[in-house]
């Protein structure tokens, strides 16, 4: 009984300290980001590129080009090259840039964008 009470107490203490550490870390990150100068936009661009616009893995299989709305190439700062397709329903799909179908879809999207631009 004493062992289970001690284990439960220890677990509660670890949980409380862990959540406090997360709050402190979030506050420090926000503070440091607010101290970055907007003139140093390369740092911010790198921060966002690594977190948002890098592919950590590629989706398997093929993607119908008709489901795609746009694309962007990942930054050279990313650990892995990639193309991120945005689907018409808002999903982001990471694909290998060396895939032949990816190249075909990119060409199709470029042509569609040019046609839309000329109509306006």
From Swiss-Prot:
Disulfide bonds join 54-78, 55-94, 65-105. One of its GO terms (biological process) is cell chemotaxis. One of its GO terms (cellular component) is extracellular space. The keyword Transcription regulation does not apply. Keywords: Chemotaxis, Cytokine, Disulfide bond, Heparin-binding, Inflammatory response, Secreted, Signal. InterPro entries: Chemokine_b/g/d, Chemokine_CC_CS, Chemokine_IL8-like_dom, Interleukin_8-like_sf. Transmembrane segments: none annotated. It is found in: Secreted. GO terms for molecular function: CCR chemokine receptor binding; chemokine activity; heparin binding. PROSITE patterns: SMALL_CYTOKINES_CC (PS00472). CDD domains: Chemokine_CC. Belongs to the intercrine beta (chemokine CC) family. Shows chemotactic activity for monocytes, resting T-lymphocytes, and neutrophils, but not for activated lymphocytes. Inhibits proliferation of myeloid progenitor cells in colony formation assays. This protein can bind heparin. Binds CCR1. This is C-C motif chemokine 23. It comes from Macaca mulatta (Rhesus macaque).
């Amino acid at each position: 009984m004493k062992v289970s009470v001690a284990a439960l107490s220890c677990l509660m203490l670890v949980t409380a300290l862990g959540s406090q550490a997360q709050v402190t870390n979030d506050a420090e990150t926000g503070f440091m980001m607010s101290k970055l100068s907007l003139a140093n936009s390369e740092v911010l661009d790198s921060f966002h590129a690594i977190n948002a616009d890098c592919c950590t893995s590629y989706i398997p299989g093929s993607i119908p080009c008709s489901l795609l709305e746009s694309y962007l190439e990942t930054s050279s700062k990313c650990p892995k090259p990639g193309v991120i397709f945005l689907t018409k329903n808002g999903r982001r799909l990471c694909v290998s840039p060396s895939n032949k179908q990816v190249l075909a879809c990119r060409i199709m999207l470029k042509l569609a964008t040019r046609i839309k631009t000329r109509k306006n």
